[in-house]
């Protein structure tokens, strides 16, 4: 693929973005505006989550929720367009998110979202020198105007040319495996524990205890495609006329490929040559995808009656196609807050190189033994 010059971060564009800070607008055209059983199931299958609470409607109807209920990470599929992104042509590396969940995300709920640009922080990074950490804040409400959740997400905006020239990840190589190594990894999937209908009581939780790990990988482009099926078109994956119309409005969101066709910058997740143009050795996962994996550690552990009130995660390193991940957690604290019984949990994920690529934490409300 021919190397080209990409746009640069300018003072004028930063000043323009500063003027947009705090302006709250409608989150337009989300992939999911309604929480339905099918939408929940598609999202869960997109991360390989077989929890029956998300995929078996009859089972979900028998739980305390009296129907399917979505995990917090489902809200990634409810994000929409509208908030100022700015910095046209400057690559966006998704770096993390935080959730505050106020009400269960039950099937049958219609969601209304608003979004605002709430942060623009200059950073000096090893990856691409001057970068800009952007924060967007989403507020999701139901038909009664009750707040369901507040979600913040962060992007590191980096100049593609600088990132490629600095070549921070030149020693990072896509993984390969022998048949016996694949067999060993696949056997670990059988050890996954879904608590399900067996309640996890607050009384029984021990500070320091570890949560059963969740394994993902070795990552394939197929897994990224499955994620997109559940997550949706956002941010730039539009077909034919929709794609052409989006390109006409936002030409800098597309980069011409070797065939002379404008194509989405999102193809870093399935086109290894294009990924190399932005300074990464090969295609890699989506940040929200890995955060959803980490959230699965919680939902597997807490059982059907648990409720995640807070959850945050930061992506620290790339997860290349071919990498395998072990997502884990540990109980840090137990406490009573008014009539709620809460557990604070530390979360992390490591790849086959034993490098920690994602960190996070959560507060989970658990039932008390009667």
What are these regions (language model features)?
Residues 308-313:
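A short glycine-rich, hydrophobically flanked beta-strand micro-motif that places a catalytic Asp/Glu
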